[in-house]
């Protein structure tokens, strides 16, 4: 994971299902990106930091957080089954989060945004 204070991700394999939780990650550094691609390869579920929109991301460079477009690219490249965007900006309301989900689904239909109470079954 690429974050100024460090971060870690989790890859859990159970009964043939693969769950990847990638917290606090800013795309753009080739070495961590390559490691993350290997880490997320063929995951059934990928939960990915998408705090920013692609438009916001350039001015937030160095903060250690991702955006939905990077998440979609990773999911496509890694043949992920389901993408769940999380680590939403705390200033966003539910409508703004829904708008992000809709935008991401135009590129990767199996995308959703994590919400309080979300239950994931593998």
Language model: regions and residue ranges:
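Extended recognition/assembly regions associated with phosphoester-bond processing machinery
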Residues: 20, 120-122
């Amino acid at each position: 994971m690429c974050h100024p204070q460090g971060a870690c991700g989790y890859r859990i394999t159970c009964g043939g299902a693969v769950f990847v939780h990638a917290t606090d990650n800013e795309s753009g550094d080739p070495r961590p990106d390559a490691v993350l691609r290997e880490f997320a390869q063929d995951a059934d579920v990928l939960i990915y930091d998408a705090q920013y929109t692609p438009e916001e991301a350039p001015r937030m460079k160095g903060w250690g957080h991702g955006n939905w477009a990077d998440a979609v690219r990773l999911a496509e490249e890694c043949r992920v089954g389901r993408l769940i965007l999380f680590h939403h900006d705390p200033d966003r309301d539910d409508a703004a989060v829904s708008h992000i989900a809709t935008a991401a689904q135009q590129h990767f239909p199996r995308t959703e945004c994590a919400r309080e109470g979300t239950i994931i079954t593998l």
